[in-house]
Amino acid sequence: MDALRRLSVDQWIVYLLYGATLCIPLLPIGGNVLVILAGLLALLFDRQRFSGPLHWLQWTVLAYIIWTGISIINSVNVQWSAMSWGYHIAIYGTVYWLMTYYMNTEERRKRFLSLFCITGVLVCLGAAYQYFYMISTHIHEWVDNVHFPGLMRRMYGTLQNPNLLGEYLLFVLSIGGLGTIQALKEKDWKRCSKMGLALLIMLLCLVLTYSRGMWLSLAVTVFVAGLCVERRLLYALLVVPLVLFFYHGEVSSRLWSLFSGQDTSVMLRWALWDSTMYMVEDFPVFGIGWDAFWMTYPDYNYFIQDPTVIIYHAHNLYLHVAAETGPISLCLFLAILLGHSRNMQKGNTRGIPYRYGMTLVTVSVLVSGLFDHALYSQQVSLVLWQLLGFAMSVIRDES
């Protein structure tokens, strides 16, 4: 207790951010509470830390926050959109600003990255328990039984959806994989063996999500890592044709289905994208309103005949953001992602995870966003904004 009393406000906020890193993917309500507590402490007792000039990327983040807030005026349910904006965007902005100003030492950053990867392993352990010992009541929603009759379960864990777990694992694999490469180059065999084992666990879990979009994102992410970091990584892509040629189970069936548009999920996506484009045409400036897609879509629906089926998002990041908050908001969001990744690459003195971690995370978001909208999940988005804030802390420190 004496040690707790001696902690400064600065240290309390940092430990709350560490706790949020652990809780966001495992216990989201706990992560939200910790972020809000940290934000209140900073606002009440440490406001002076946030004074001073802002980086242009921080101004872009502010513009995105304001623009999404203004979009609420177009919502068919303004009260709902306002509450949802507070639950999502306000918390994203809070964790971004806190990470920017409190991950301000090398020791804190290393602890955060270590905890981030450890949390990924814990998520995988929980997902493994779910996969082997729990019966999913939603499997019929995630699998086309006509085209994949042998696929009886998919891994989702505490992320509550296979695609969301896949997106989260791509984030952790991007950071952890680069950390493993760094350890290999430094010949730190003990750390390399530990991280290599963790990567294998996470890769296996990613495979068991049976999420085709996330598999494709992983392949593109590995390709980019091979071009930017280590050319020998490109040989890993040879695993894909080998699996398709020699293995004929459900994994290969899902992979082959990428080249076919016959299953219902693909046909549904085409119909959703078509309807969403009409929304963008009708609301070209501020969109239909933050988190108003599921309320507005029935007016544009021509594919789903069951009125009880609710479509929460467009299964496409670009179309969904453009429809809800306008094309300008989409441009701001893309500028945030690409700007942070590009600025992180500029520091030649930084380690590999620092220089290219945000690049690989951005690639995974942009590629998976072509087929799904995993950022609709507050858990996944909060992790992304935490990483963006971490990147900004490094950018500000060196600029």
Which residue stretches match the model-derived regions?
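Transmembrane signal-anchor hairpin modules in multi-pass inner-membrane enzymes, especially those
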Residues: M1-M83, T94, N104-K110, S114-C117, ...
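Long extracytoplasmic/lumenal interhelical loops at the membrane interface
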Residues: S260-D274, F286-T325
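Alpha-helical transmembrane segments of multi-pass inner-membrane proteins
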Residues: L16-A20, A38, T94, K110-L151, ...
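Loop-to-helix entry and N-terminal half of a specific, functionally important transmembrane alpha helix
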Residues: W12-A20, A198-L200, Y312, N343-F371, ...
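A membrane-periplasm/extracellular boundary helix in multi-pass inner-membrane enzymes
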Residues: L125, Y131-M134, T209, A225-V266, ...
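Juxtamembrane membrane-water interface segments that cap and precede transmembrane helices
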Residues: I13-Y18, N145-T158, W270, Q305-L319
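Membrane-embedded alpha-helical segments of multi-pass membrane proteins
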Residues: L26-D46, W85-Y96, L165-L173, W215-F223, ...
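Transmembrane alpha-helices of multi-pass inner-membrane enzymes
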Residues: L37-L43, A219, R232-A236, G357-L370, ...
